[in-house]
Amino acid sequence: MRRTFFKAKIHRATVTHADLEYEGSVSIDEDLLEAAGIWEYEAVHIWNITRGTRLQTYAIKGERGSGIICINGAAAHLNRPGDMVILATFAELEEAEARDFKPTVVLVDRQNKIVAKDAVEVPGPARRVTA
């Protein structure tokens, strides 16, 4: 039996742009995509910490090293520059794969620069990035 598991996330990223006129998707700095193991055109959940909204779209490559997180298309109504978001992906795994699987968690600062990458989530305020 296949089950759906949390695969990766870019945690507490800052939305840099919102482009209502673009066809759709979320543009993500290519450095962040690579760090999280998120592929271009992969389904991505966007959980807006600032506004409490949630949606699903797909990732496209943004300029490497730019820190860009641009919410495109209709999703721009739900996300604005300066909002803090979590970008997450999921994967379907067979039981044998899932036993040893560990998700990737990428923590970023307010400029969307990577400050940590690991596979362990620690709840609570001690883990939060405030830089």
From Swiss-Prot:
Main localisation: cytoplasm
CDD domains in alphabetical order: Asp_decarbox
Domain of life: Bacteria
SUPFAM superfamilies: ADC-like
Record-linked Gene3D superfamilies: 2.40.40.20
Catalytic activity field: L-aspartate + H(+) = beta-alanine + CO2
GO CC aspect terms: cytosol
Binding site for substrate: 57, 73-75
Claim: Cytoplasm is one of the keywords in the record: yes
Positions where Pyruvic acid (Ser) occurs in the chain: 25
Cofactor needs: pyruvate
PTM characteristics: Is synthesized initially as an inactive proenzyme, which is activated by self-cleavage at a specific serine bond to produce a beta-subunit with a hydroxyl group at its C-terminus and an alpha-subunit with a pyruvoyl group at its N-terminus.
UniProt cross-references to HAMAP family, sorted A to Z: PanD
This protein's name: Aspartate 1-decarboxylase
Gene behind the chain: panD
